[in-house]
Amino acid sequence: YILNMVYTETLREEEGGTYGASANTQCIFEPISMKTMEIAFQTNVEQADKLRELAKSGFENIAKNGPDAEKFDKAVNNLKKEIPESRHNLSYWSNALSTSDKLGIDFNAEYENAVNSLTLSDVQEAAKSLISSGNFIEIVMRPE
């Protein structure tokens, strides 16, 4: 959520370069533990390189300085709001049962606890961890 807000502000509103950008993270535990983040947006050829650099610098800024407190609060409040809503979805319970079985934890309770205890520092450390991994793939598709 935080990066989505950053990118709406910079890539869309300030630069007028895209209708929207999305940042999605995923944690995988098997067969190996892995964290991934995908940042995606569409733009015109003329602005592609500039927006790509702005997207990277927005993420790097969070790793270096931590997230903006207002954006952090909005993101956490949104996550808290989604918890009871998610519990009405089969996919939530499928994931909760699978995670509980594989990791031996009560996903339903632990997820809510994790959201409630999330700090600005946690977000900054997660960003640092992703950047310091050194695994970075950049894909730019341009028309011929």
How would you label these PLM feature ranges?
Residues 1-8:
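His/Glu-based metal-binding/catalytic segments typifying zinc-dependent metallopeptidases
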Residues 8, 12-117, 134-143:
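M16 family metallopeptidases and their MPP-like homologs
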Residues 121-128:
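Mature hydrolase/peptidase catalytic cores and their serpin-fold inhibitory cores, especially
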